[in-house]
């Protein structure tokens, strides 16, 4: 794939982007993780009560107007344009009300689809819906232990009032990310930093989309694109422009040099 590629993800999406940066090494030139769900076991999904919140969430309303009123109340801190998009795309008419002018509506994404992000659906294998051990998804904890294997620079973009990216979590992210030096190329540096958007919670990209976009654009333009164009991109382009004969000569010279080092 054509580089540079930038990975951007929020919450569980941030965890998935970070995981992809490890499992598909060198895919990303940099990644921006917005309030990512990444942490040790004592800060994992089991401690957040997300499964209980999901099961209690209302998913149906008598009319579209009722649904819109409920969503605007629940997400009142969101940017108005973002909230309009949520309402436009997150609810749909129930089958029995399609022909009606205004009938019952439901969330497009049901509780089950959200719940399996947090708790493993053990009933699928066992065939039993009760009596099974409650097992939370381990992705966020797994990724926490893999942070040292990250092979690109990273920006953690956090909500100032978020219960997920608390100071301890941010300190752990910064201290562990991309710290294993064995996978670096000669002269390669990996920048790891954080930015905090004040007065926002876990939904910071929905609450302050412009500020988040400005921070992301600044990170990409001033830091990563300059670094890419000056270093990795330039070096790779120079190699690609060489003839096959020149590449072979370069490879032979390199192997001859290695004989005195190995």
UniProtKB/Swiss-Prot annotation:
Superkingdom of the organism of origin: Eukaryota
GO molecular function, one term: hydrolase activity
Sorted UniProt keywords: Hydrolase, Peroxisome, Virulence
GO cellular component: peroxisome
Pathway given in the UniProt record: Mycotoxin biosynthesis
InterPro entries (alphabetical): AB_hydrolase_1, AB_hydrolase_fold
Protein function: Abhydrolase domain-containing protein; part of the gene clusters that mediate the biosynthesis of the host-selective toxins (HSTs) AF-toxins responsible for Alternaria black spot of strawberry disease by the strawberry pathotype. AF-toxin I and III are valine derivatives of 2,3-dyhydroxy-isovaleric acid and 2-hydroxy-isovaleric acid respectively, while AF II is an isoleucine derivative of 2-hydroxy-valeric acid. These derivatives are bound to a 9,10-epoxy-8-hydroxy-9-methyl-decatrienoic acid (EDA) moiety.
Family: Belongs to the AB hydrolase superfamily. AKT2 hydrolase family.
Protein name: Abhydrolase domain-containing protein AFT2-1
Species whose genome carries this gene: Alternaria alternata
Lineage per the UniProt record: Eukaryota, Fungi, Dikarya, Ascomycota, Pezizomycotina
